[in-house]
């Protein structure tokens, strides 16, 4: 899975989670890999 795909999946999941629960998830699983809050925020801030 390419980083662009990982970033897109994280973004979709995080937006939906925030929309329904009002806060960002503690962690996100993408492609059988679990990313912590710090890790997925780093990925979302990357310029690709």
Language model features with spans:
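Acidic, low-complexity, intrinsically disordered interaction modules
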Residues: 2-48
């Amino acid at each position: 899975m390419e980083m662009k795909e990982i970033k897109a999946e994280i973004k979709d999941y995080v937006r939906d989670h925030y929309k329904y629960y009002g806060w960002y998830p503690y962690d996100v699983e993408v492609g059988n890999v679990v990313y912590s809050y710090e890790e997925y925020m780093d990925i979302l801030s990357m310029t690709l």
